């Protein structure tokens, strides 16, 4: 594989020295970019875009052509695993993802297969290989998966949810059924992420989008427990380099100590957690990624720069910070505002890395 020309992102995740704070954006390949919309129109629909390695590579590369980002992230979806398990993923206009065959009982869980990542999910691995070739060592490629708990929310609810009543009913009335489902999902995620690493992903991230809807005790038992299992099962060195793993629980700022104790390399922060406080609590164990409110990208460039400056000052001097948004970029953000954000991170972070 090509030698990395810019390894700032990987170095920051391992709390090694960098010249400026690295930056990328969750959902950086997405609907805020007109070129993404054009490519998606060619593909026909979202899953066709994910399943076409050349087009998935094209949309992964689009933000890198516009902005000096320090990492690329695989263009895919967190629901590829449940789809490969046979639940029949489809997208309702204006409704988001849905499943034709949601999980309703223990028998449904027992018959779920664990997908072979090079077979049922081979299209994802083809995309990883294609993107790595196209990147030619410019920046590292991030692979990712949803967390078992977050995947389970969609699989049991049948799609997106606000209250998660079906899943919470299972959690409290049939906890063993839910544990069986989460265990199968953790095994599937380990295989899936390890296959991405073998195909060329240089760092991986686990997105626990819905962990924040749980009580502390339930989070430990039904979400973090399974992310810990994943961290333990991942390939941590490939191609002569450490493969850093980042855990991100949206709404999980109160559990950072427990998350850091999993042995992961970095934690993602949403914008509701103060980054200075987070660094005081866990900065000696893990790197931190985040954590600007994505809605600030609606503001003028001067306001974006002010927020970047505040977050950089909050983290302070030294290593172990990857700048990002606290969640995905919104689809109606002007692309030039994203550009102002990336430029501000690099320009304003230099003084924090001078010896």
From Swiss-Prot:
One cellular component term from this protein's GO annotations in UniProt: cytosol
Gene Ontology BP terms: protoporphyrinogen IX biosynthetic process from glutamate
Family that this chain belongs to: Belongs to the uroporphyrinogen decarboxylase family.
Record keywords, A-Z: Cytoplasm, Decarboxylase, Lyase, Porphyrin biosynthesis
Enzyme class: lyase
SUPFAM superfamilies: UROD/MetE-like
GO molecular function: uroporphyrinogen decarboxylase activity
Residues passing through the membrane, by range: none
Species per Swiss-Prot/TrEMBL record: Yersinia enterocolitica serotype O:8 / biotype 1B (strain NCTC 13174 / 8081)
Main location class: cytoplasm
Protein name: Uroporphyrinogen decarboxylase
Compartment(s) of residence: Cytoplasm
Function: Catalyzes the decarboxylation of four acetate groups of uroporphyrinogen-III to yield coproporphyrinogen-III.
InterPro entries: UROD/MetE-like_sf, Uroporphyrinogen_deCO2ase_HemE, Uroporphyrinogen_deCOase
Pfam families recorded: URO-D
Assembly description: Homodimer.
Catalysed conversion reaction: uroporphyrinogen III + 4 H(+) = coproporphyrinogen III + 4 CO2
EC code: 4.1.1.37
Superkingdom assignment: Bacteria
Gene name of this polypeptide: hemE
Positions annotated to bind substrate: 27-31, 77, 154, 209, 327
Annotated site (Transition state stabilizer): 77
Pathway the protein acts in: Porphyrin-containing compound metabolism; protoporphyrin-IX biosynthesis; coproporphyrinogen-III from 5-aminolevulinate: step 4/4
């Amino acid at each position: 594989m090509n030698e990395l020309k810019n390894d700032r992102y990987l170095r920051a995740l391992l709390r090694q020295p960098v010249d400026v704070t690295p930056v990328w954006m969750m959902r950086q390949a997405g609907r805020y970019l007109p070129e993404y919309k054009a490519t998606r129109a060619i593909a026909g629909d979202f899953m066709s875009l994910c399943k076409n390695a050349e087009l998935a590579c094209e949309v992964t590369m689009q933000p890198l052509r516009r902005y000096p980002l320090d990492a690329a992230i695989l263009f895919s979806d967190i629901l590829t695993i449940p789809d490969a398990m046979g639940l029949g993923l489809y997208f309702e206009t204006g409704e988001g993802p849905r499943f034709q065959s949601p999980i309703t009982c223990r028998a449904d869980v027992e018959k779920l297969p664990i997908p072979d990542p090079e077979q049922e999910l081979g299209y994802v691995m083809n995309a990883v290989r294609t993107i790595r070739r196209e990147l030619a060592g410019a920046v590292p490629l991030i692979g990712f998966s949803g967390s078992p708990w977050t995947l389970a929310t969609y699989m049991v609810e049948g799609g997106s949810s606000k209250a998660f009543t079906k899943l919470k009913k299972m959690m409290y009335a049939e906890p063993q059924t839910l544990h069986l489902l989460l265990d199968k999902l953790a095994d599937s995620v380990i295989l899936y992420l390890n296959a991405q690493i073998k195909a060329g992903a240089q760092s991986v991230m686990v997105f626990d989008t819905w962990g924040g809807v749980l009580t502390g005790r339930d989070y430990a038992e039904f979400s973090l427990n399974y992310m810990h299992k994943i961290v333990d099962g991942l390939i941590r060195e490939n191609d002569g380099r450490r493969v850093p793993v980042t855990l991100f629980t949206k709404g999980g700022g109160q559990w950072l100590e427990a998350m850091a104790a999993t042995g992961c390399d970095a934690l993602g922060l949403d914008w509701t957690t103060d980054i200075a406080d987070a660094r005081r609590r866990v900065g000696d164990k893990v790197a931190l990624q985040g954590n600007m409110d994505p809605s600030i990208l609606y503001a003028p460039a001067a306001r974006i720069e002010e927020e970047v400056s505040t977050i950089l000052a909050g983290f302070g001097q030294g290593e172990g910070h990857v700048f990002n948004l606290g969640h995905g970029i919104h689809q109606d953000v002007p692309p030039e505002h994203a550009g102002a954000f990336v430029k501000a991170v690099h320009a304003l972070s230099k003084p924090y890395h001078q010896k």
